Amino acid sequence: MKFIIDRFDGKKNYEQIYTLAKEDIEAKTLLGVLLLIKQTQDITLNFTASCRMAICGACAVRVNGHSYLACDTKMTELFEEYKNSDTFRISPLGNHRVISDLVVDWEPAIENLRKIKPGLVAKSEFSAKEGCQQNQEEFDRIIKQWDCILCGSCVSECNKFSADQSDYMEPFVFTQAWRLANDSRSKDPMIHVKPAVANGLWNCVHCHECTNRCPKHISAAEDIANLRVMAMKKGLNTGVGPAHAKAFHTDLVEGSGRLNEIRLALRIEGVATVARTGMAITLMRAGKMNPLEIFGGHTIKGHEDLVKMIDAAKAATKE
């Protein structure tokens, strides 16, 4: 079997090919393969690993363009996923600066993590003597987010981060913000929510790749949505993002039951929408947009049932 590893020596990028017999690796994990290559073929190969138990998150890499936790990925699973392939390309995590081979720079991510104040500020009712406890129901609200091991797989898969990192944070940072804000022991959830809003909470593009590739099956996309709801309930409801969310709700409940894209632009950007006239003309020519829908489209079948479902969801959230 052929393993093409993307390498970096501090000056140039290059790829190196290693060959291993299938029978020698089929009982190993991906990390086991990397260790075998380092021990038997190339001691200069650099990668990070520690616990080998899917706890520390240090060994995440990409295989054929997708993120995997190396110690938690069996080679038999990769054989099954990439059937009829005898070649695997192993690369460092995407959306990170590469330091050496499969080793990436975590400092920018840690700086973003600091922004959301990643430590619990407990309510005054707790003390060092009595402890800082919560019941099982309260813990269950955040138990999934506690599973995050900061492996960076979500960052590597994030399409928004690939496009522009200047106005966004790593998905796991928002997961940590939600865990802290939703903790029943927290003195002030907003000390975590406000910096999340200020650093791109509304810029998620909803591709859900962070969720799809998380080795711990955490939905960072859902955590982002929950942070948005909390932010709006606390009065942080101005700007393009909240206006977009409100427009969706208005069209679903008060409108026809489907998004009116012409009105959406006007609600969000107002007169600034004029700058998108060229795009609007292109869409109309392609039959993708009907200008008459600005007056409202036809109501979808079953709209009353949709409204009932939304009302029921709201009621359940309040309980």
Swiss-Prot record:
One cellular component term from this protein's GO annotations in UniProt: periplasmic space
GO terms of molecular function: 2 iron, 2 sulfur cluster binding; 4 iron, 4 sulfur cluster binding; electron transfer activity; metal ion binding; oxidoreductase activity
One Pfam family this sequence matches: Fer2_3
Cofactor note: Binds 1 2Fe-2S cluster. Binds 2 [4Fe-4S] cluster.
EC number(s) given by UniProt: 1.3.5.-
Binding site for [4Fe-4S] cluster: C148, C151, C154, C158, C204, C207, C210, C214
SUBUNIT field: The MFR complex is composed of three subunits: a flavoprotein (SdhA), an iron-sulfur protein (SdhB), and one hydrophobic anchor protein (SdhE).
PANTHER family reported in the protein's UniProt record: SUCCINATE DEHYDROGENASE [UBIQUINONE] IRON-SULFUR SUBUNIT, MITOCHONDRIAL (PTHR11921:SF29), SUCCINATE DEHYDROGENASE IRON-SULFUR PROTEIN (PTHR11921)
Family: Belongs to the succinate dehydrogenase/fumarate reductase iron-sulfur protein family.
The protein, known as: 8-methylmenaquinol:fumarate reductase iron-sulfur subunit
Organism field: Wolinella succinogenes (strain ATCC 29543 / DSM 1740 / CCUG 13145 / JCM 31913 / LMG 7466 / NCTC 11488 / FDC 602W)
